[in-house]
Amino acid sequence: MFQKFDNIHDCSFAEAIRVPVGWGALDKLVRWFYSGELPRIAPDCRWKNMSAEEQLSYLKPYAELSSLAEFWLLEGVKEASLEVVASCLNTSTGASVEFIGFAANLGQWELVEAAVGSVAHLYPKLRDSGQLEQLDEDVLNMLRAEYVRYSQHRGVSY
């Protein structure tokens, strides 16, 4: 009645599945499973007064969660993560450069584009200060192109 398959290795017995996420992302994922919504970061005066490191610690889990959502095909999580990140970076750009590097390392290009858009207007200042040296050439090209678009748009408006 039962057949034995000696050549098939069942991966369901694996002791651990390794995914590049921290506890913050897992906490948000569990909340999403139970409520259907990701916890939001209020981009209020408290957010604006946080240090860049504090802001980055709040944003990183959303990049990790976006990566996980892509890997596990969790519909809506990637988009919700993008919304949270974009709303925060549009109100305060303190952690943007570091976040760009982090999201790029995870291959989260939609998040990178959102972060690039939030700091494009600061490109000359960031370049001159040396803050962009940590970014790879592809990301720098994205930032330069977005700055050119920003400059052209600004030049057209009165």
Predicted regions and their residues:
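Canonical BTB/POZ domain core
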Residues: 1-91
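Alpha-helical protein-protein interaction/assembly modules
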Residues: 44-63, 75-158
